[in-house]
């Protein structure tokens, strides 16, 4: 049989669509394939094309849930955190965790520092510190790709504190938040290192607020295409790594509306932005959709994504009133409901433990350090 060499551009296009856990096994095929893991362009392009998954933890374990639309059906994987030389348990390190560009940043109530973890590449990096990281925090990075932690409360006149990961004991700066900002109404998302939230100002307007780690400024990014209603639940998501989508759930009617920004989002340092155009993508009514409790801060009860290849396919993961986890796949007027069967009870829902996660080839070793108080595991 005569071997056929495909054009390298076609090989890359195929590999873009292969999940990270499978790509990791292909590193031994040839040097050229192995070099892709060090190619920033390939890593970034793969992240754009990677299909989001759901992640959640129980009292003792952590799981990822991949959705396959051909059935549809789901794959549930238990994620293990095995760190040689460090006596740790999964519940301790997953006391709180956030994600940024496919990396999980985990904090422990027993260890002072932060663990950076890519569960698909099975790579971790542990940064020691002389302080515990806050319980409410989000992760982003500045224009030099230095990862930083934002400690936030987002109440009038509350302080915003920045910590730089890789510095052993440096608290960068305390910042006063804008007192006109009333309450955070959605989860936070990170886009190109900048953080975004949906929320309400004192005049009941609905906006997206942003925080830039490059300028250390908290600003109003744009107005949202809806009115404030305390019965609504909002969720913000990144679509194809360059646009925002917004989900609004009316808890009374179970009607769900989805908007999508028309154009790519740039990290613009401006005040109120009126030129962000939102397109109403769909309105759906899911029968017997659970009634979700109201929460002021990052809602752990509902998370979602839009299919990268078909923006009008909506996938939602949420709890019902009995804390059972379900996935809803919505395309036009067809709704598929899939139960996630687990043998242990979920954590108290006050814990932020249900998330959308994008598998990536980003390695923890790409996080820079400025001191020798570092463990590479």
From Swiss-Prot:
Residues 1-46 form the F-box domain. PANTHER family: F-BOX ONLY PROTEIN 10-RELATED, OS09G0372900 PROTEIN-RELATED. It comes from Arabidopsis thaliana. It holds the Pfam family FBA_1. Gene3D superfamilies: 1.20.1280.50. The gene is FBX10. This is Putative F-box only protein 10. PROSITE patterns: FBOX.
């Amino acid at each position: 049989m005569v071997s056929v060499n495909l054009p390298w551009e076609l090989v890359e296009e195929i590999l873009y669509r292969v999940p990270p856990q499978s790509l990791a096994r292909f590193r031994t095929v040839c040097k050229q394939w192995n070099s892709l893991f060090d190619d920033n362009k390939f890593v970034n392009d793969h992240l754009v094309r990677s299909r989001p998954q759901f992640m959640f933890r129980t009292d003792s374990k952590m799981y990822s849930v991949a959705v396959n639309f051909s059935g549809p059906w789901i794959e549930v994987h238990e994620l293990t955190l095995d760190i040689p030389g460090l006596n740790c348990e999964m519940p301790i390190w997953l006391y709180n965790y956030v994600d940024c560009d496919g990396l999980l940043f985990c904090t422990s109530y027993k260890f002072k520092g932060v663990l950076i973890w890519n569960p698909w590449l099975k790579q971790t990096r542990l940064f020691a510190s002389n302080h515990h990281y806050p319980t409410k925090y989000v992760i982003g990075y500045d224009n030099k790709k230095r990862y930083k932690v934002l400690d936030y409360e987002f109440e009038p006149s509350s302080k915003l504190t920045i910590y730089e990961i890789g510095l052993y004991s440096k608290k960068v700066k305390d910042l006063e938040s804008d007192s006109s900002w009333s309450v955070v109404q959605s989860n936070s998302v990170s886009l190109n290192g900048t953080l975004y939230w949906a929320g309400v100002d004192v005049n009941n307007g609905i906006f997206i607020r942003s925080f830039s780690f490059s300028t250390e400024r908290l600003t109003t990014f744009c107005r949202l295409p809806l009115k404030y209603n305390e019965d609504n639940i909002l969720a913000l998501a990144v679509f194809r790594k360059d646009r925002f989508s917004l989900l609004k759930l009316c808890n009374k009617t179970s009607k769900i509306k989805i908007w999508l920004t028309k154009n790519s989002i740039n990290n613009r340092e401006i005040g109120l932005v009126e030129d962000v155009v939102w397109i109403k993508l769909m309105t759906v009514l899911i029968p017997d959709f659970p009634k979700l409790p109201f929460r002021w801060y990052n809602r752990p009860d509902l998370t979602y994504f839009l299919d990268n290849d078909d923006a009008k396919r909506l996938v939602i993961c949420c709890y019902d009133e009995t804390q059972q986890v379900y996935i809803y796949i919505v395309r036009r007027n067809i709704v598929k409901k899939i139960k996630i069967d687990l043998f242990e009870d979920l954590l108290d829902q006050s814990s932020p433990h249900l998330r959308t996660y994008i598998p990536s080839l980003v390695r923890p070793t790409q996080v820079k350090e400025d001191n020798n108080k570092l463990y590479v595991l």
